[in-house]
Amino acid sequence: MVKTKDYYTSQKSEFFTQFDGFCERVGALIEKKYGEKFKNDVMGEIKREFELIFDEIPYIGGDENFLTMDLVSAAQDLALYQVLKRYDKPVEEIGEIAYQESEQYLRDNADLIPPMTHPKYVFYIEMAAKGSLEREYSGDWAYEFIPGDGENDYGLDFIECGIQKLFHEHDADEFTPYLCAMDIPMSECGNLGLHRTQTLAEGGDRCDFRYKGGRKTEVASTVIKKG
């Protein structure tokens, strides 16, 4: 069984293939906003930055933790942020590019969004939540399962966030709320009916996810005014 950092080494080819797709999408968005020359100047830097960050992604259980992919995906956005900040681009513009990339990917690949309101998946999430509270890995999320009450199929209260921890280590706290906002298109494209009023990254004491399949997504965000 692959353990600790060996996991990322064993999966590097797959993760970097996914990163190539990310680069195609953000490259088009960067060119649209800043021009072809700027895109050509920075894309190589973004790829090198991701290679550096990739080597520092904390192990949180590998394939046994469904949030591992979220952490790797966030590292892609972090590479984008770090490079564009060096070119003095404001966080609002970087965040807009990152959000648009995520929105495009989710709309084009809605079939890949986990069926988070399906009863079998809800049971899996409940078990995962219990395991997260053991805090086996310092870079992981910790979250509590909230049983359904009629109004919601179920909820999750995140009290620790792996993305927030990773971004804090890289002095990217101002960028974290844009990753929170990406839950909006995920809910819309997956028909998850997410309601959320606060996040850790935006000053809350938890991220209060509440799911109800089929209803309208309503997510409070300090950076994206939508949903």
Which residue ranges define each predicted feature?
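Amphipathic interaction/junction segments at domain boundaries or subunit interfaces
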Residues: V72-H170
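Hydrophobic, Leu/Ile/Phe/Ala-enriched alpha-helical segments that form helix-helix packing faces
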Residues: I30, L84, S132, D183-M186, ...
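Short coil/loop linkers at secondary-structure junctions
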Residues: K37, P90-V91, D173, G193
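C-terminal structured interaction module
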Residues: P177-G227
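Non-catalytic recognition/regulatory regions in large multidomain proteins
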Residues: N152-D157, F167, A172-L179, T197-E202
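N-terminal, charged low-complexity regulatory/assembly segments
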Residues: M1-L84
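A short, structure-level motif marking secondary-structure boundaries and short turns
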Residues: E64-F66, F167-H170, V219, I224-K226
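Short, conserved micro-motifs enriched in small and acidic residues
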Residues: L67-L71, E174-A181
